[in-house]
From Swiss-Prot:
Name under which the protein is recorded: Flagellar assembly factor FliW
Entries under Gene3D superfamilies matching the protein: BH3618-like (2.30.290.10)
InterPro entries from the UniProt entry: Flagellar_assembly_factor_FliW, Flagellar_assmbl_FliW_dom_sf
An example Gene Ontology CC term for this record: cytoplasm
Any one GO biological process: regulation of translation
Species this chain originates from: Geobacillus thermodenitrificans (strain NG80-2)
Length: 144
C-alpha cells in the first residue's frame, strides 16, 4: 500500500510492517497504525502515522546515548503487547529536535515499546522514576 509521509515523501509499505497502537499515542489517541522508517545515514527512525502524513515522530534506540537507561514494564503492558521475553521487545524514545541540533532532547519518561513479532506498540508513561521528558542528547555541550 502507498502512504504519504512527513520525511520520506510517498512510499510503498507492506501491511506486515504496520505497528498497531491499540490505545493510540497520548495526544494522538485516534492514531493507531504506524510504520518505522529509518532515516538514511543517521541513527534516527521515524515513527510515521499510516493515516496522517504530517504525523511522524523522530525516535532513537536510547542505549547509544543513554547506556544505563533501564525500564521495568508492568504486567498490564506485558499483557497488552503480548510480550513473553526480552527477544520480543524493541525500545525507542521520542526526540524533540532543536535548532541548534545540540539542544535536542529525548523523552526517557515515556518510551515507545514495540513487540517486534506481534507488531504491537505502546507509549509507556513511567511513574516512580527519575527519568524526565527532556534529557539532552549531548549534555557535554550545555552552555557554560
Amino acid at each position: 500500500m502507498k502512504i504519504a509521509t512527513k520525511y520520506h515523501g510517498d512510499i510503498e509499505i507492506h501491511e506486515k510492517d504496520i505497528v498497531r497502537f491499540e490505545q493510540g499515542i497520548p495526544g494522538f489517541l485516534e492514531e493507531k497504525q504506524f510504520v518505522l522508517l529509518p532515516l538514511e545515514d543517521t541513527p534516527f527512525i521515524i515513527l510515521q502515522s499510516v493515516n496522517t502524513p504530517a504525523l511522524g515522530f523522530v525516535l532513537i534506540e536510547p542505549f547509544s546515548y543513554f547506556p544505563t537507561y533501564e525500564i521495568d514494564l508492568d504486567d498490564n503492558t506485558l499483557e497488552q503487547l503480548q510480550i513473553t521475553g526480552e527477544q520480543d521487545v524493541a525500545l525507542y524514545v521520542i526526540l524533540t529536535v532543536a535548532d541548534p541540533f545540540d539542544d535536542t532532547t529525548a523523552n526517557l519518561q515515556a518510551p515507545i515499546v514495540i513487540n517486534v513479532h506481534k507488531r504491537l506498540g505502546k507509549q509507556v508513561i513511567l511513574t516512580n522514576t527519575n527519568y524526565k521528558t527532556k534529557h539532552r542528547l549531548f549534555p557535554e555541550k550545555v552552555a557554560k
